[in-house]
């Protein structure tokens, strides 16, 4: 039979084989070698093995390689909203919160012509944060404050350099340290070192009001190793953030230091606040802080040329509780050496999430300062935390009792701390506070 007569049969056989190959699973030997696009479309093509196919990367391949979101909200960060570069080298975090209060105050013996009862609303403070890092080593923070009268102030503005990463777990802190330059809070007292949102109570204690340095301008270095860490600072001293050049009336220079050691535990995050949320490990922290200040030539007459303080605090924190006790001794050279001291003891306990109860006792003793009496106050309250991952959202109800005539003590009366001017007798307050932000 002529070969030409087999042509239709050969073509038919070839088509059957190719159709069968197309119907086989992709992993079978025939399917692996079948042309792309389906056998029926290529029945007349050469039977030579095809060239290896090259898969072009998709147009958005660069996007698929991005490991970090360029914007979003991070619950693990104090200020959650962020914008960052694709490699996460640059990052900007933004946050804000306010403390809105309704106060009721009773005076046993009001000043002449004054009412024995006062009440009203108050925005105690509003804080706005811009913080982050330019690289993994270079950090920055800007913090604005709006006070109860609506005045704006640049509370914090610093740049920092992290020479070595710091970690919460003590066993990972092998010589971590950094340096911050600019306006910042100074590490002496643990209470004053805390953000207002992270306090146990609605407000700082009267002891803190009398002795705290607050924000100042200068340099502050930090070092952390294993279970110990320390801060060293050279700044323009107490109230230094409110001074200008050349009329610095507060101080010429303040040398300060604070050291902390964990007597029990190895997780520093237990002591990131004074609240003591549930789920934390047991820890005990001992801290010591001190400062020495030299007043400048523009200081008002009668201001001490030399002054200083020493603070010792002990904190115990664990699963749903935290307690703090500290004492501070302050001195000033005003002709003769004058000294005073203060003491704070406080503790809070979560009955259940999200409900916490707390108490605080505070004392300010004038020491050898003449014509003053001792300040005694007791505070009781409760906090409700709707969210487990932040202290920024909080509802508080708090009552306070002052056992002294505040005008005769070292403490300056004002509506923020809750004690109003009075020359005689005790006073009481009831406060409702809504703290909220993002």
Model-derived features: positions:
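Outer membrane beta-barrel
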Residues: 80-240, 249-266, 273, 277-279, ...
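Low-complexity, intrinsically disordered short segments enriched for Gly/Pro and polybasic residues
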Residues: 271-273, 284
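Outer-membrane beta-barrel pore domains
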Residues: 63-73, 107, 114-115, 141, ...
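Bacterial N-terminal signal peptides
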Residues: 13-26
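Active-site cleft segment of glycoside hydrolase catalytic domains centered on the general acid/base Glu
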Residues: 245-247
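N-terminal secretory signal peptides that target proteins for export/translocation
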Residues: 1-10
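N-terminal periplasmic/intermembrane-space "pro-region" immediately following the signal or transit peptide
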Residues: 27-99, 106-109, 169-173, 268-270, ...
């Amino acid at each position: 039979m002529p070969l030409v007569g087999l042509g239709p049969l050969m073509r038919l056989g070839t088509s059957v084989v190719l159709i069968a190959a197309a119907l086989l699973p992709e992993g079978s030997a025939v399917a692996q070698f079948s042309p792309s696009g389906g056998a029926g479309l290529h029945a007349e093509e050469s039977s030579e093995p095809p060239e290896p196919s090259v898969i072009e990367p998709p147009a958005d391949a660069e996007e698929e390689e991005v490991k970090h979101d360029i914007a979003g909200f991070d619950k693990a960060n104090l200020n959650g909203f962020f914008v960052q570069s694709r490699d996460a080298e640059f990052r900007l975090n933004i946050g804000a919160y306010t403390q809105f209060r309704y106060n009721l105050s009773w005076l046993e013996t009001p000043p002449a012509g004054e009412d024995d009862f006062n009440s009203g609303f108050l925005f105690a403070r509003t804080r706005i944060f811009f913080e982050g890092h330019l690289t993994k080593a270079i950090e920055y923070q800007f913090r604005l404050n709006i006070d109860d009268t609506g005045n704006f102030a640049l509370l914090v503005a610093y740049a920092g350099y992290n020479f070595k990463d710091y970690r919460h777990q003590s066993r990972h802190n092998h010589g971590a340290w950094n340096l911050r330059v600019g306006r910042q809070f100074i590490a002496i007292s643990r209470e004053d070192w805390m953000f207002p949102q992270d306090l146990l109570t609605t407000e700082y204690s009267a002891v803190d009001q009398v002795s705290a340095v607050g924000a100042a301008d200068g340099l502050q270095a930090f070092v952390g190793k294993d279970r110990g860490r320390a801060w060293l600072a050279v700044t323009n001293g107490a109230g230094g953030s409110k001074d200008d050049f050349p009329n610095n009336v507060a101080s010429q220079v303040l040398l300060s230091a604070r050291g902390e050691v964990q007597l029990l535990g190895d997780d520093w995050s237990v002591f990131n606040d004074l609240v003591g949320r549930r789920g934390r490990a047991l820890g005990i922290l001992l801290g010591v802080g001190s400062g020495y200040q030299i007043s400048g030539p523009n200081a008002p007459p009668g201001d001490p040329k030399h002054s200083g303080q020493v603070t010792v605090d002990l904190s115990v924190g664990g699963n749903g509780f935290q307690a703090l006790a500290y004492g501070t001794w302050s001195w000033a050279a005003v002709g003769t050496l004058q000294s005073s001291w203060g003491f704070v003891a406080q503790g809070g306990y979560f009955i259940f999430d999200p409900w916490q109860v707390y108490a605080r006792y505070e004392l300010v003793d004038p020491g050898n300062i003449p014509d003053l009496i001792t300040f005694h106050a007791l505070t009781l309250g409760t906090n409700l935390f709707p969210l487990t991952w932040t202290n920024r959202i909080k509802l508080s109800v708090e009552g306070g009792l002052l056992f002294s005539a505040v005008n005769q003590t070292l403490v300056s009366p004002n509506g923020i701390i809750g004690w109003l001017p009075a020359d005689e007798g005790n006073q009481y307050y009831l406060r409702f506070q809504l703290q909220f932000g993002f």
